[in-house]
Amino acid sequence: MSAKGCLALCLTFVSMFFGIAEGRADSALTFENGKIQFAGIEMPYRVAHVGGTGNPSLVVYLHGGSSKGNDNEKPLNEAATDSISRYLESRHIESIVLVPQCPADKSWGGPMLEVLKSLIDKYAEECTDFYILGGSMGGTGTWSMLSVYPGLFTAAMPVAGNPSKCDADHVAQTPVFTVMGTADRIMNVEETSDFVDQLHAHQGIAEFEVEEGWTHEMTCIQSYTTRRLDWVFSHRRNPSSIEKATMGGSERRVVGYYSFDGKALSEPPIKGAYIVRYAGNCGEYSTLKKMK
């Protein structure tokens, strides 16, 4: 075989391998194109509907830095998009999956958090539970969303991200499963470990796993296992009985109502979604309630 033929064969095997790791060629889900504008920022996104049972969930995946742009295509090629979509299908979880794309000149922080919130608001009325997951820049963005919008999400899974600038008290209001790799040269494992300790100190529910030898890229690709996703999606809300929500087996009382932007409400609205703050002998906790 000629050198050119050998090279072509090698490239074929390489593309086959990475097609499995990063592609979505055989995914059953159809992602439709969408676009949203907020505060002068235009953000493309993809949306797919997963059929299943029960009340629908809203699932948001935040991509890493290499998928920024406006083609509305690169985020779908990330391995996590496929892993999460397949999981939802296999578990028959009725859900709306959102995969937004960050503009090339921005990151998942600052004003982009408000843009993401406006996208979530667009679909909030249809869903009972909200989940957010992300890797690398998307992992950091996931941490940031938990910090800026405490109690909005039912559970979250940031991987290979940086939570060091986040408010641990706010983040602790959402159950979190995070993963890091010992060979990650971009994110700091110790910083994440310290932050998880802070979450525990605030009575937060947080799982932290460190994979030996995993690089930054490996962590972003391989973290979304069935076992971990089972943990994330095992957290559910029950809007019909939210006033009797318990934590640690104790009854809790309502101490306040808030809009999604943190403004205190004198009473719950007669329509729409809002946040309820509870208090009890296990501390305070925020969760979402919907009125139709």
Please report, for each region that a protein language model flagged, where it lies by residue.
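Residue-level detector of functionally pivotal "anchor" positions at catalytic/ligand-binding pockets or at interdomain
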Residues: 237-263
